Regions:
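Long, contiguous amphipathic alpha-helices that act as assembly "spine/axial" helices in icosahedral shell
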Residues: 50, 77-147, 156-171, 195-197, ...
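Short solvent-exposed strand/turn elements
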Residues: 279-316
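Short helix/loop capping segments that flank catalytic or ligand/cofactor-binding pockets
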Residues: 58-61, 175-178, 258-259, 390-392
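N-terminal "assembly arms/tails" that initiate or stabilize quaternary assembly
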Residues: 1-78, 397
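Protruding loop/beta-arch "assembly-hinge" segments enriched in small, turn-prone residues
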Residues: 1-29, 42, 185-217, 312-404
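Beta-strand elements of well-folded, non-transmembrane domains
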Residues: 54, 252, 385-389
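Autoprocessing Asn-cyclization modules and mimics
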Residues: 175-291, 401-404
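Short, Lys/Arg-rich flexible segments
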Residues: 2-35, 93-103, 112, 117-135, ...
Length: 404
């Protein structure tokens, strides 16, 4: 009976931990599970390639009858996802001493859950915002509701069928003023999910206050960058004073919609990483070169997305036009389709000799293992939150870059 009681207590405490983490990850609440059945047996820290179906090409017209030259196989996009893990630990004496739920929640679950959730949130945002196909730059003094309406319109133009979410630092909403904030429409459903972080709906985007949206600090004189390589493993650029988050456009490169059709929006490329000297950068987004269908014969040369169709721009030596041309701090605001973010949890293998519990609440799966170190006679609780967080489609994300 004692073991049964202890097991129940461990499960209950693990559940409260999972709930506390789930309360502190607003960014990943706007996500979709694509890989739940594909990660079983996969190992933390390793990167795996997964494949997502493409809508393919369609043809219409009086001459579009012969399918001889049509592609006979389903197109698939390859996306690399790394299995991540967030962890913390608690000394067993603290864990066992707190037998009342309220005390445990206040002293262990909430503070540890907030810490774990914060790390997951920062990791997801840091990697996620850079997978965006479009951006608008505006000075803080000129910021208005038209700018929010603009990125909402950009998202609608790509004909995405999901629900749009927007994330910005709390100071951004404060800068809009009470009059403009009154234009955001309330939603009981969103309020239940995001609680006090939910601002409201504007132009079909549900806006959420998120403390960890990044601020770019740009220093030094920015010279024109050059594209040195475009391939299936990404894009390489060289320049001066490059930085992670450096945004640029290429000549005649435009965004495409969900069906591969060219839009009027210029395609934006965002650098993931740079060398220590800031002279070389890399975009990890895969790019595939191909020809278009007959209806796109003239437009295919300028069609471009992170995994889609290029024509003539699949060459090196192109001059990159920088979106940010002045030194200073720039606040990043992101609006995206919730389905553009892949989020899944998985389970670590059981540890022999440990008492364990695994519980899921909302988007979070929490694993707790209890064990003793014979050498030190110390007993410890290990808490893990294994996860996959990966933006899989830059077409469905837009940025508002605000010069502070």
């Amino acid at each position: 009976m004692a073991n049964e009681t202890n097991t129940f207590s461990l499960n209950r405490k693990t559940q409260y931990l999972a709930a506390a983490v789930n309360d502190n990850v607003p960014y990943i609440q706007a996500s979709r599970s694509y890989l739940k059945d594909k990660v079983e047996g996969k190992k933390c820290g390793l990167t795996y390639n997964f494949y997502f179906p493409d809508p393919g090409k369609a043809y219409a017209g009086t001459s579009e009858v012969d399918i001889t030259n049509d592609l006979k196989v389903v197109q698939e996009r390859e996306v690399s996802c790394t299995l991540m893990n967030a962890r913390t630990s608690v000394e067993l004496g603290t864990w066992e001493r707190l037998t009342e739920i309220e005390s445990f929640v206040n002293e262990v679950a909430e503070p540890r859950g907030m810490t774990l959730g914060t790390e997951i949130e920062i990791d997801s945002i840091t990697r996620g915002w850079k997978v965006s196909d479009g951006a608008r730059v505006v000075a803080a003094a000129d910021l208005g509701m038209d700018d929010l309406a603009g990125i909402a319109a950009d998202l609608k133009a790509i004909r995405s069928r999901g629900k749009f979410r927007g994330f910005a630092d709390p100071s951004f909403f404060h800068s809009l003023g009470a009059k403009n904030l009154s234009l955001f429409l309330p939603s009981d459903i969103m309020r239940e999910i995001y609680r006090s972080a939910f601002i409201g709906n504007y132009m079909d985007v549900d806006w959420v206050s998120e403390t960890y949206m990044p601020t770019l600090s740009v220093t030094g004189t920015m010279t024109s960058a050059k594209v040195t390589e475009i391939g299936t493993d990404g894009v390489s650029v060289t320049g001066t004073n490059l930085y992670a988050g450096y945004m640029f456009e290429l000549p005649n490169a435009y965004c495409v919609d969900m069906f591969g059709r060219k839009t009027k929006q210029k395609k934006v490329f965002i650098v993931d990483s740079v060398n220590g000297a800031g002279t070389a950068g890399k975009l990890s987004q895969r790019i595939v070169c191909s020809t278009g269908n007959a209806a796109e014969a003239t437009a295919v040369q300028t069609n471009c997305n992170t995994f889609g169709t290029f024509g003539s721009i699949c060459t090196s030596g192109l001059t990159a036009t920088s979106l940010i041309t002045e030194s200073g701090d720039y606040s990043i605001v992101q609006a995206r389709d919730a389905d553009a973010l892949e989020w899944d949890t998985y389970k670590h293998p059981s540890l022999a000799g440990c008492e364990e519990s695994t519980q899921r609440v909302g988007k979070i799966t929490c694993q707790v293992a209890k064990w003793a170190n014979i050498a030190t006679r110390q007993q410890v609780m290990r808490i893990d939150v294994p996860y996959i967080s990966q933006m899989i489609d830059g077409r469905r994300s837009r940025l508002l870059v605000i010069k502070l």
